[in-house]
Each structure stands twice: as structure tokens, then as C-alpha cells.
């Protein structure tokens, strides 16, 4: 299990090296393939490796907002080295995880998407999250200190 500090440092490193905190652009900069498939409405995305080639599959039914955070979540699986045995990100499992690979992936997602953002520029958490493309259910993963 990775620590929250390790994940935050890794997210900073990834954003710094890619020159962006946009999950889709991070994939592009790092040779991580992203494709869209018909996964139905229940699933948002999945991460896997095919012959050591990283691949993020996003649902063709996702909107742009869902693609963005699902991609960030799946990047968490890639950079936290979870391998191929991760859960599919589903609309039904967007609950708060306190440990394990889903917790780490969610923590990584919010850390890359908030990297370099000055929280004081926003009056409410909702404004901050909307501006950064983070879903409200992910608030519990954000360290506001």
C-alpha cells in the first residue's frame, strides 16, 4: 500500500514532467494509450497492460467530464503500479475507499487535477471542483490543509 505522501509526491512529479495536470494530456505525453469502447452506462473505465503497453479504456458513453476524472483515476492505477487486477471504475463503486488500489487511484486523481491550483482563488469547494474537473464525490480525498 502506498502512503498518501508518496501518492502526492508522485502526482506532483507526473504533472511536472508532463507540463500539465490534464489527465488526457498526461497520457499523451507518456505514451499511455487511451481508447473508447462501448462499456455500457455502468462502467466509466478500466486500466490494463497488453504486452507491457499501458492502456486506459474509457466508456464511449462517458461525457467529457466523466472521461477526464475516469482517466485521472486510471492513471492512478498506472503510476501506483497496481497491475492488471484492478476493479473496473463503475458508477456503482464511487464510494469512499479507505485503503487499497481504488483508494490510491482516487487519491492520485485528485492530486494530479489539483496540482498547482491555489485553493484560495475559489469561494466554495464546488467552484474549485467544477473548475478542476473533479466530481463532488471525490471531496473526501482532498487534503485542504
Predicted regions and their residues:
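Active-site hotspot residues in diverse enzymes, especially metal/ion-binding acidic/histidine motifs
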Residues: 1-145
Amino acid at each position: 500500500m502506498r502512503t498518501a505522501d508518496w501518492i502526492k509526491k508522485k502526482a506532483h512529479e507526473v504533472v511536472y514532467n508532463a507540463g500539465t495536470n490534464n489527465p488526457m494530456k498526461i497520457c499523451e505525453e507518456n505514451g499511455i494509450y487511451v481508447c473508447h469502447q462501448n462499456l455500457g452506462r455502468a462502467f466509466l473505465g478500466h486500466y490494463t497492460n497488453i504486452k507491457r503497453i499501458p492502456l486506459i479504456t474509457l466508456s464511449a458513453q462517458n461525457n467529457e467530464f466523466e472521461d477526464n476524472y475516469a482517466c485521472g483515476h486510471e492513471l492512478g492505477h498506472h503510476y501506483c503500479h497496481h497491475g492488471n487486477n484492478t476493479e473496473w471504475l463503475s458508477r456503482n463503486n464511487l464510494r469512499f475507499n479507505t485503503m487499497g488500489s481504488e483508494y490510491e487511484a482516487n487519491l492520485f486523481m485528485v492530486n494530479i487535477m489539483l496540482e498547482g491550483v491555489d485553493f484560495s482563488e475559489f469561494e466554495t469547494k464546488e467552484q474549485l471542483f467544477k473548475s478542476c474537473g473533479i466530481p463532488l464525490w471525490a471531496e473526501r480525498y482532498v487534503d485542504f490543509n
